């Protein structure tokens, strides 16, 4: 039996979660109707807060994997609904390996799809950065005419965000500026690029998958330190895009593409039946007890 886990960091804002993560799940269930699909939050603290607040319960990654084992599911496909391979993603990957190599659960395969920003487009690999920029620009196109688009990442230092800016500058989206709230590229550096572009009209788009109330208040709220207020103070005319990237249907399709790649890869590397394989541990991507990719 096969199962799919849709894994995000999580949020306590139910409406925003359903518009983003929920929409992706609906597409996954439609495409893979023969598989069990589960939603998990990678933040245990958010799992606890969500389950205290709402009747519809959310599982942690560990709980979902244990439940799959009880149901007899032995092939698991995990699609992280995350921008980058951050600390939560790495921790989830370690947990997945432990489940795969444990005789207690009986998993033959555990396959992990890519986060949104992974492949650079070299050596015939897909360019996730260019595809993401194209998906954003295509979705906001009607409100972005004759404007610079400012992408705000709500996070700290991630090389992926700097790479996204470089990809934009090298031609994928020359009117796009990227900055992070607590890291690099900085807001001040974004102002320098905006000054060079010469546009006085801006569209600010959150580079976050879930458009929570808290995030939108930070972007366009009446507080003096909102991104809207700071840009207006610099003399710009500012519009705010009030959606997380997870609500963008083109971004949703990129996650579906990554999930499909993980499923196809597992089919190509399908191991021999478990009873005919000696339980030998190796460092290769294909293990004697199963696979993780």
Where would I find each of the regions flagged by the language model?
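Extended amphipathic ligand-handling, pore-lining, and cofactor/metal-binding catalytic surfaces
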Residues: 1-203, 208-293
């Amino acid at each position: 039996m096969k199962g799919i886990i849709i894994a995000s960091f999580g949020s306590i804002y139910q409406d925003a979660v359903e518009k983003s993560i929920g929409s992706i799940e609906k597409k996954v269930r439609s495409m893979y109707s023969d598989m069990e699909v589960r939603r998990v939050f990678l933040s245990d603290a958010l799992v606890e807060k969500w389950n205290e607040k709402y009747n519809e319960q959310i599982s942690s990654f560990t709980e979902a994997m244990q439940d799959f084992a009880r149901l007899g599911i032995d092939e698991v496909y995990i699609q992280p609904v995350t921008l980058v391979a951050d600390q939560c993603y790495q921790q989830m990957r370690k947990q997945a390996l432990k489940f795969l190599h444990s005789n207690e659960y009986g998993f033959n395969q555990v396959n992990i799809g890519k986060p949104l920003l992974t492949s650079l487009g070299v050596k015939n690999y897909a360019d996730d950065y260019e595809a993401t920029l194209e998906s954003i620009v295509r979705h906001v196109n009607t409100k972005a005419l004759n404007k610079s688009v400012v992408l705000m990442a709500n996070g700290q230092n991630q090389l992926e965000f700097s790479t996204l800016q470089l990809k934009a500058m090298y031609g994928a989206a020359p009117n796009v500026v990227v900055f992070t709230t607590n890291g690099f590229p900085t807001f001040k550096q974004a102002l320098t690029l905006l000054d060079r572009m010469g546009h006085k009209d801006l569209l600010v788009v959150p580079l976050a998958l879930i458009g929570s109330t808290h995030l939108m208040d930070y972007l366009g709220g009446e507080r003096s330190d909102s991104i809207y207020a700071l840009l207006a103070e610099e003399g710009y005319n500012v519009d705010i895009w009030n959606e997380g990237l997870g609500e963008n249907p083109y971004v949703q399709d990129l996650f579906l593409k990554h999930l499909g790649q993980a499923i196809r890869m597992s089919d190509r590397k399908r191991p021999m039946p478990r009873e005919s394989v000696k339980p030998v541990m190796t460092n290769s991507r294909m293990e004697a007890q199963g696979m993780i990719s």
